Regions:
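Conserved residues at the C-terminal ends of beta-strands
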Residues: 6, 63, 148
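Conserved acidic, metal-coordinating active-site core of Asp-based
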Residues: 95-98, 102-196
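Pocket-edge positions in alpha/beta enzyme catalytic cores
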Residues: 11, 15, 77, 177-181
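A short, flexible beta-alpha/helix-coil linker loop
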Residues: 10-11, 67-68, 173-175
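Asp-based phosphoryl-transfer active-site loop
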Residues: 1-16, 88
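Residue-level marker of alpha-helix boundaries and capping positions
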Residues: 17-18, 39, 79, 148, ...
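Active-site phosphate-binding/coordination module
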Residues: 21-116
Length: 196
């Protein structure tokens, strides 16, 4: 009775950056037959503003399982402690890596040099982003974060000193998605299934 779809590369074409009408129609039909339809994405809730109207759905599962909303109600919102976020952001900047902190309301981008092209692209793609903060100035809600590194970054120092309760997913080309240990997209699915 519950269907879960990813955004990037599943509903949203990576080529056209649009959702095919056939997918919108299929979602509508599924809902009319009584099925619950959810978007389950690695993006944080603060990053989905530009895609919230792709189709009418029952809820959003975001941030690699750290946030779940169903029928307009937040039923999971795993936040990282502010002190931990500030410490990790400082570590990233000191190791010459860019860090993109993702939360339910807003995203933060901290960078020593701003030289990473992918970081520039992330800032453009995800509308509600506060840029170029000093790590200690980050004071909002954060569910997860991404690290962007290159040959000038101190990756060894960065990962040696990263908190042990953070799961690091290597996405390739110096891009790392980092989530509180124990959270995956399946975590949010389980929360929805338990609620219904």
């Amino acid at each position: 009775k519950a269907l879960f779809f990813d955004i990037d590369g599943t509903l949203l074409s990576e080529v056209t950056k649009t959702v095919p009408e056939s997918a919108k129609k299929a979602i509508s039909i599924a809902r009319s037959l009584g099925h619950l339809v959810y978007i389950n994405t690695g993006r944080s809730y603060g990053e989905i503003g530009q895609v919230r109207d792709i189709a009418e759905v029952d809820g959003w599962l975001c941030g690699c399982g750290t946030y779940a909303e169903s029928e307009g109600r937040t039923i999971l919102n795993r936040l990282m402690p502010v002190e931990q976020v500030q410490r990790i952001a400082r570590l990233a900047v000191d190791c010459d890596a860019d860090i993109f902190l993702e939360g339910p309301g807003v995203c933060y981008y901290c960078s020593k040099s701003g030289r990473m092209p992918f970081g520039q692209q992330l800032r453009k793609n995800f509308g509600n982003t506060i840029e170029w903060l000093e790590p200690e100035a980050v004071c909002g809600e954060v569910n997860k974060f991404c690290l962007l590194t290159d040959e000038q970054s101190d990756r060894v120092g960065l990962f040696r000193n990263l908190d042990l309760d953070i799961a690091v997913i290597d996405r390739g080309e110096g891009f790392y998605e980092c989530v509180p240990e124990g959270f995956t997209k399946a975590t949010a699915i389980d929360v929805i299934l338990e609620a219904y």
